[in-house]
């Protein structure tokens, strides 16, 4: 090979190496940990919700199973602010002022709980860091767990896991879309399967 061709070949190799070093790495599928969603769980913790204009915070307890959901939201002083109970036949919201609202499903009542709509069926996946079908995992942490998921216009950030085990459930989750934002600090997890 002539010196000029060797030089061009070497230059092409160096340029290729430099360009690949500048490329944004994408999470490798084989690095991702397969996470299965639990059909039954209980979580307890602290939460805050804001629609950009108004916000509220308090405690939350959520019992989820195949028959439905029971979500109780407590005020910062520990009083029940709202209780949402859903089943395949419908949903009911009871508020601290004695109001009772009914709808076909829990999602229809979420604006009364948080001030904006939230897809409850997908939220059950999100809190477990088990993205539902169609969700895009944009970032993984060092253990191969979701760090950022985009799903139906919602951004789900996993801010903390309690340890480095691959299948550990998250303890800090932030869900947002536009000005709507829910922050969860989960103090208690129970998988009930």
UniProtKB/Swiss-Prot annotation:
Q: How does it sit in the membrane?
A: Lipid-anchor
Lipid anchor positions (N-palmitoyl cysteine): 22
Cited InterPro entries: LolA/LolB/LppX, OM_lipoprot_LolB
Instruction: Kindly indicate where the leader peptide sits in this chain.
Output: 1-21
Indicate yes or no for the key word Iron: no
Entries under Gene3D superfamilies matching the protein: Lipoprotein localisation LolA/LolB/LppX
The record's keywords, sorted A to Z, are:
Cell outer membrane, Chaperone, Lipoprotein, Membrane, Palmitate, Protein transport, Signal, Transport
Q: Where do we find S-diacylglycerol cysteine lipid attachment?
A: 22
Which GO annotations describe the biological process of this protein? lipoprotein localization to outer membrane; protein transport
Does the keyword Protein transport feature in the UniProt annotation?
yes
Which cell locations does it reside in? Cell outer membrane
Q: Name one GO cellular component term.
A: cell outer membrane
Q: Please give the NCBIfam families that the UniProt record associates with this protein.
A: lolB
Its subunit composition reads: Monomer.
* Record family assignment: Belongs to the LolB family.
Question: What is the documented function of this protein?
Answer: Plays a critical role in the incorporation of lipoproteins in the outer membrane after they are released by the LolA protein.
Name of the protein described by the UniProt record: Outer-membrane lipoprotein LolB
Its lineage opens with: Bacteria, Pseudomonadati, Pseudomonadota, Betaproteobacteria, Rhodocyclales
């Amino acid at each position: 090979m002539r010196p000029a061709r060797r030089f061009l070949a070497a230059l092409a190799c160096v340029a290729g190496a430099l360009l690949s070093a500048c490329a944004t790495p994408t999470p490798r599928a084989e690095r991702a940990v397969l996470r299965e969603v639990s059909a039954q769980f209980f979580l307890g913790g602290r939460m805050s919700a804001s629609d950009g204009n108004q916000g509220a915070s308090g405690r939350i307890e959520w019992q989820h199973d195949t028959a439905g959901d029971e979500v109780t939201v407590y005020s910062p002083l520990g009083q029940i602010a709202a209780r949402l109970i859903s089943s395949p036949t419908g949903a009911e919201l009871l508020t601290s002022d004695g109001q009772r609202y009914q709808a076909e499903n829990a999602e229809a009542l979420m604006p009364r709980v948080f001030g904006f709509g939230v897809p409850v069926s997908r939220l059950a996946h999100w809190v477990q860091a088990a993205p539902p079908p169609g969700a895009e995992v944009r970032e993984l942490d060092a253990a191969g767990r979701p760090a950022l998921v985009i799903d139906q216009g919602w951004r789900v950030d996993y801010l903390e896991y309690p340890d480095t085990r691959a299948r550990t459930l998250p303890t800090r989750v932030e869900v947002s879309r536009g000005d709507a934002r829910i922050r969860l600090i989960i103090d208690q997890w129970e998988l009930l399967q």
